[in-house]
Amino acid sequence: MAVPDFKKSKFPALSPDITDKDILFEDNHLIAVNKRAGDIVQVDDTGDESLDEKVKRYIAKKYNKPNGAFLGVVHRLDRPVSGVILFAKTSKALDRINKMFKSRDMHKTYWAVVRNRPAQEQGTLIHWLVKNPQKNVTKAYEKEVSGSLRAELHYKLIGELGGYYLIEVDPVTGRPHQIRVQLSTMNCPIVGDNKYGYPRGSLKKSICLHARRLQFIHPVKQEPVNIFAPLPKDGFWDRFENF
């Protein structure tokens, strides 16, 4: 398996508009998109167009809404992370989904590719995290410290190819950079994530962390919803599609 050559990667053009193939789930209340690595979910100080604006434009065009469409941001993914992200199309759905996230009634599953094999094939990681907003870096502590938030996740090794290891992660909490920093604490930094210990960064604005699945009970219809995000088609992730 070829090592991904991050140093020679070309910096990407601005991410294109949302199309039907990017939509993972949609009804009158919710819409889920397969986020591309490099997209920002909401506007920030970079000035780059955000994913929520692209989704608003997609809805307005699809349903002929010249005055624009309502869209509520339910949760976020870090810019270099890909995968399923959910938005609310109505204020009622937004309110109910927000309550579900706070009560941890949303089950999220991520896939991460790391270079080092975990010492234990499965386990639970618990840390106390402190984020430095100026540097946009989160630090993990073994014990509670001033200003820290408890972070918990479960992980399982599910495959290996060419010296790279595929880990499935189920976060219990949703802290900033949680998966990235917690995997790094067990000497398993995510491929491409030099912010948390991988030796080479990615000029593609991407790391090998993908929000693979989101499961919950629909806030209005009260039906089970299981949203599954295909892996990025970038030549590296393709090799893990059959796991």
Language model features: what each stretch is:
Residues 1-243:
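RNA pseudouridine synthases
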